[in-house]
Regions:
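Cytosolic-side transmembrane helix boundary signature
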Residues: 1-13, 95-112
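Hydrophobic alpha-helical transmembrane segments
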Residues: 18-23, 85-107
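Alpha-helical transmembrane segments and their helix-start/interface "positive-inside/aromatic belt" motifs
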Residues: 6-22, 110-123
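Long, glycine/tryptophan/cysteine-rich extracytoplasmic
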Residues: 29-86, 133-170
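Hydrophobic membrane-targeting alpha-helices
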Residues: 28-31, 103-106, 129
């Protein structure tokens, strides 16, 4: 099988790049990760949104972030402040730039640029995943030795995918 990276994009490739550009632009404004916490003490649950224009925000008009920070204190986790993460300031800008790149590439129909932009976006996704994993690891494992509640061997790193039970929280 021989690949041809020269010439113009096909109509279907153009459409896919336009759709990718639109969805990438939308993702710049929405949270990319959500943590839901429920426990007998919090039957209504708490929500933490990560990503989008707000960076890090809590449900219940921001009150959930305050409550989560209070609970984090008891197990020795650091407080979560939106300003602590430069990535959330940069993320909407980077996603917006990729959206524009996808749309421009679709309209100029350049195969090489389309391949380069998709590879760049893939690399960005992998690096973002690694960075996000690093932050969750740091927050979940670097616990204060002065924490009021200590559970030997317990880490509080939230899963990037899926679910995890943390103490009484589902």
């Amino acid at each position: 099988m021989k690949f041809n990276f020269t010439g113009k994009l096909s109509k279907s490739s153009m459409i896919l790049l336009i759709v990718a550009g639109i969805f990438t632009a939308i993702s710049a404004f929405t949270s990319v990760w959500r943590i839901d916490l429920t426990a007998p003490q919090y039957p209504e649950g708490m929500v933490l949104y990560i990503g989008g224009l707000d960076g890090v925000s809590g449900g219940d008009e921001g009150n959930d972030l305050y409550k989560i920070n209070e609970l984090n204190h008891y197990v020795g986790m650091a407080q979560i402040h939106p300003g602590d993460f430069w990535e959330f300031t940069a993320l909407p800008i980077i996603l917006g730039a990729f959206a524009v790149l996808f749309l421009v590439t679709a309209f100029i129909k350049n195969k090489k640029l389309s391949i380069a932009s998709l590879i760049s976006f893939g690399i960005f996704g992998v690096l973002g995943f690694i960075d996000f994993y690093h932050w969750t690891y740091v927050y979940g494992h670097n616990l204060s030795p002065d924490a009021p509640i200590k559970v030997p061997g317990m880490s509080y790193q939230p899963p990037i995918l899926g679910e995890k039970q943390l103490l009484s929280f589902d």
